[in-house]
């Protein structure tokens, strides 16, 4: 069972941690738009799920500096003589400054035992990106210009939206008011818009692509055949439309294997605001970027080309942001 269920679990983690092209579509949701960098657009509370399409920069324009955490637990179980359960956990944390600097970390424990967990942390401070893998030293990333750092941050921050995408049509029903961090908030109850509604279809396999192997076939079976069976949750929105707290508990079946059940629980919340959020500072004594093989660097230096290379500004890669 563990071999059968684990690919499904990894498919879910891949879908949740790599938000992909759906981000652009999500940001076009009604109610999600933002104005220029100084003034966010008025939020449309008739479409509260649009709040989950706001990125971290959008939210900081509405709330100022903030600290945010999220935990996501995925589990896959299968009934029968070989019944077993596989579990994985994601943990995310973001500190976002109103100045645009940020610190983000993401960890995944795939449930495979000691040493299987992995993670990454990225800091964007003072126009420089710094990154490290879990247990590794900090390194500078001078060629990033913030693009990859922001993508990594936004993948974490969009975790609630990614989970709800697996659920298909979702209803958000007004459920009164609450107070979060001393701020008034509107509460919405989350549920499936129609019982047993199919989730969006997975992208079609490219023409001419080779037949998938056994594990890939299991992943595709879930992504293409998942059936949302239940959803219970709540969404609390600030008066500006920024999401202050999200809770989601959802379950899925698989069309071609009724013995398989997948469940996910997510809890995300803003933990601090304004002066409660520590300043975003560069890490102490980061190492230089070492992604260029040492042998290549040595050969350039020996040939007298390294100084010239360092003196000439690097050409921006396609899609890079302007240097800051």
What do the PLM-derived regions correspond to, one by one?
Residues 13-16:
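C-terminal motif of bacterial Sec signal peptides marking the signal peptidase cleavage site
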Residues 7-11:
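Small-residue packing motifs within transmembrane alpha-helices
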Residues 18-324:
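Subset-of-secretome marker
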Residues 1-6:
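Bacterial N-terminal signal peptides that target proteins for export
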């Amino acid at each position: 069972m563990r071999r059968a269920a684990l690919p499904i679990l990894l498919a879910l983690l891949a879908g949740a941690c790599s938000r992909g092209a759906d981000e652009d579509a999500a940001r076009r949701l009604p109610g999600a738009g933002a104005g220029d960098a100084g003034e966010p657009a008025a939020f449309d509370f008739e479409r509260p799920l649009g709040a989950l399409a706001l990125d971290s920069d959008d939210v900081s324009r509405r709330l100022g500096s903030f600290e945010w955490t999220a935990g996501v637990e995925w589990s896959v179980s299968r009934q029968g003589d070989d019944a077993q359960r596989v579990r994985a956990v994601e943990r995310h944390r973001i500190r976002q400054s109103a100045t645009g600097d940020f610190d983000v970390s993401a960890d995944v424990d795939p449930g495979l035992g000691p040493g299987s967990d992995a993670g990454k942390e990225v800091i964007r401070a003072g126009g420089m990106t710094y990154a490290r893998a879990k247990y590794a030293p900090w390194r500078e990333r001078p060629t990033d210009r913030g693009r990859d750092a922001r993508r990594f941050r936004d993948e974490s921050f969009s975790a609630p939206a990614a989970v709800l995408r697996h659920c298909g049509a979702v209803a958000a029903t007004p459920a009164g008011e609450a107070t979060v961090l001393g701020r008034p908030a509107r509460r919405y109850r989350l549920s499936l818009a129609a019982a047993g509604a199919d989730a969006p279809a997975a992208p079609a396999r490219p023409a001419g692509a080779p037949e998938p192997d056994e594990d890939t076939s299991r992943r595709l079976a879930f992504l293409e055949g998942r059936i949302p069976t239940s959803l219970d949750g709540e969404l609390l929105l600030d008066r500006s439309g920024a999401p202050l707290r999200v809770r989601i508990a959802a379950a899925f079946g698989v069309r071609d294997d009724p013995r398989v059940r997948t469940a996910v629980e997510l809890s995300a919340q803003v933990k601090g605001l304004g002066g409660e959020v520590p300043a975003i500072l560069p890490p102490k004594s980061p190492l230089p970027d070492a992604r260029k093989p040492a042998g290549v660097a040595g050969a350039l230096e020996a040939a007298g080309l390294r100084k010239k290379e360092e003196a000439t500004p690097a050409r921006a890669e396609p899609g890079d942001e302007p240097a800051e």
